[in-house]
């Protein structure tokens, strides 16, 4: 009887430890940061390859940089901090009336697999953010970074990318880390 009790308690302890370890592992997987993760925004290896083959979405990077650098005359900000794309990016006349750089960006995004659109846009956004950091512009940097990610978030919708309407980038903007 003592052997059975010992065996049952040892089995329960083993399952408890196994469950506890797998819960911890799951939390670690979801809490990884792009800065410390060698894969960066590319959790899917296929997307990293597509990003490199698309020359890092050059036109999209240029568009994001242009939008970030525009102060007053660029995309409109509503009072609640949301981006108003209707005036500046979406044209009722269709894609032929888009600014040429935006049209090139949309063409690049249409060449991506739907699964890779957001990871590649995140990679392009990070590249633009690094360009702004290297330029050393301190004034309005947080607002520029916010514009980069706001623009990138809505580009799939603006470009009518099938199966993707927005890219849910996290709004994490601690002071010195950008």
Curated annotation (Swiss-Prot):
Q: What are the entry keywords?
A: Disulfide bond, Seed storage protein, Signal, Storage protein
Name one matching Pfam family: Tryp_alpha_amyl
What SMART domains has UniProt attached to this entry? AAI
Q: Which CDD domains match?
A: AAI_SS
| GO MF annotations in UniProt | nutrient reservoir activity
Say which domain of life the source belongs to: Eukaryota
What is the tissue specificity? Cotyledons and the axis.
- The residues of the propeptide are 22-38, 75-94, 176-178
Q: How does it assemble?
A: The mature protein consists of a small and a large chain linked by disulfide bonds.
Q: So what does this one do?
A: The small, basic, water-soluble napins are one of the two major kinds of storage proteins synthesized in the seed during its maturation.
Give the family this protein belongs to, as stated in its UniProt record.
Belongs to the 2S seed storage albumins family.
By what name is this protein known? Napin-2
Q: Could you tell me which species this protein originates from?
A: Brassica napus (Rape)
